[in-house]
Amino acid sequence: EQVIARNPQVALVLPEQEFDRQLVLAGPSSHLTLEGLHMDFMRLTHEGAQYREVPHYGCILEYDGFRVLIAGDCAVADPQLRDFIGSRPIDLALWNFPLGTIRKGRHFIEQAIRPEHLVVYHLPFSHDDRWGYRDAAVKGAGQLQGVPDVRLLLEPFQREILT
């Protein structure tokens, strides 16, 4: 609600009705274009058996030929995500950290996504990391092969500039 109040021009796209002024995703896939930004959405399987029924979509954003993949909380190595990407080159993949800490997830990144840049997010803050997730994410990132640029968002409000 704060985002909408501060940015009244924003367009919210969600899989369930949450706000009065939003677009609701429905069906297996959707496409939306706003001012030159092309957005492809695909229903994906949510990670975790207890969340399988939660509506979840991945998204490929494209602007001026630059493609960004946001897979969100999709299942590790989801074949639907592989199909969704197809042969499209991915310039930047925003990747939820747990998916890159296991071999199956790293292999999927290397073989199916093949991004030029990978930004790993959703890591706990250092004072909240009682299970060692940050160290596991750093180790997993170091084991990725064939991804030219891997970055981890480890600090609050961290900013990265891609070149």
Annotate the PLM regions.
Residues 24-35, 53, 83-87, 107-163:
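Binuclear metal-ion centers of metallo-dependent hydrolases, dominated by the metallo-beta-lactamase
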Residues 1-13, 85-94, 114:
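Active-site metal-binding motif and surrounding structural segment of the metallo-beta-lactamase
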Residues 22-88, 100, 155-163:
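Core dinuclear metal-dependent hydrolase active-site scaffold
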Residues 1-31:
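Active-site HxH/HxHxD metal-binding segment of metal-dependent hydrolases
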Residues 1, 19-21, 32, 49, ...:
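Active-site environment of divalent metal-dependent phosphoester hydrolases
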Residues 92-111:
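A short, conserved beta-to-alpha structural element at the edge of catalytic cores
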Residues 9-16, 62-72, 91-95, 126-129, ...:
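Metallo-beta-lactamase
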Residues 40-42, 95, 120:
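Redox-cofactor binding/interface segments in oxidoreductases and associated redox assembly factors
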